[in-house]
Regions:
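Sec-exported extracytoplasmic/periplasmic mature domains
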Residues: 31, 49, 95, 99-103, ...
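Conserved catalytic neighborhood of penicillin-recognizing serine enzymes
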Residues: 81, 119-120, 165, 169-173, ...
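Surface-exposed patches in mature extracellular/periplasmic domains of secreted proteins
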Residues: 8-12, 103-116, 200-203, 245
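Soluble non-cytosolic domains of exported or imported proteins
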Residues: 34-38, 76, 84-92, 168, ...
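Active-site SXXK
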Residues: 26, 93-97, 121, 177-204, ...
Length: 245
């Protein structure tokens, strides 16, 4: 009995993410068959996959592969590489301080940060709170797992688990709609300055609420407002009444 006729080695590949959770909602992940299931892995799956190799071998009268008598190996063709504009340090900083802000402000629906090169529009960092490890994408956070475990009905538990998994995989920064809000205060200030309507030292008073056409608009400062402030201070405070004025 020649044992070599019965033992062979099959090569396989598996995607590994050395940085664990870093940029996980951007990168996404692949399944057991290396097919992209989320993020850029899914979007560019055809470009990244390449062409699978194969082994062609003869069979004997019993239907057993004659791998060492006749065998032809067709090599796999590698897929394309995808190079991102993300900067690993910028990405790390985005994720670190986003997590701090989400905890301090007790955000329930996850936060997001996008850092761009203002000259080219290149994305340098894109972070979403409540991310995951793409090496084990089907593992929920401790908090979400506790939520699932608290459900007794198996059908409801399965549905909740699927909901929470899809939520942690979802890239909120590009998949959810978001009203720009305070982001446009920069443009409001720029237009007012350019047209000579205000200067950096123009003053505005914030008493928390400002009435326009009978409708009250509130400042995010719940301690009675920012009081009298310059345009520069109003920008720093992101004061709603000041920019309405």
């Amino acid at each position: 009995l020649e044992i070599a006729n019965y033992i062979g080695i099959d090569e396989s590949t598996k995607r590994y993410y050395p940085n664990d959770t870093l940029a996980s909602t951007v990168l996404g992940f692949v399944g057991d068959d290396n097919q992209g299931l989320a993020g850029l892995e899914s979007y560019y799956d055809n470009e990244l996959t390449g062409i699978a190799g194969r082994v062609v071998s003869a069979k004997n009268a019993k239907g057993t592969d004659m791998r060492f008598t006749y065998e032809n190996v067709v090599e796999a063709q590698q897929g394309n590489s995808l190079v991102l504009t993300l900067d690993s340090y910028v990405q790390y900083v985005c994720e670190k301080y986003l997590d701090i802000a989400v905890e301090q402000e007790q955000i329930k629906e996850r936060g997001a940060v996008v850092a761009m090169n203002v000259n080219t529009g290149a994305i340098l960092g894109m972070a979403v709170s409540g991310d995951f490890n793409p090496n084990s994408p089907f593992t929920l956070s401790a908090e979400d797992q506790a939520t699932v475990d608290a459900i007794t009905d198996e059908e409801e538990k399965s549905a909740k688990r699927s909901e929470l998994l899809n939520r942690q995989w979802r890239n909120k920064a590009v998949s959810d709609t978001y009203e720009p809000g305070s982001v446009f205060k920069i443009f409001t200030a720029a237009v007012a300055l350019e047209e000579g309507l205000v200067t950096q030292n123009s003053t505005f008073t914030c008493n928390h609420t400002y009435i326009v056409a009978g409708n009250p608009y509130h400042c995010h400062d719940n301690k009675g407002g920012h009081g009298t402030q310059t345009l520069q201070q109003a920008m720093s405070n992101s004061c709603n009444p000041a920019f309405i004025q």
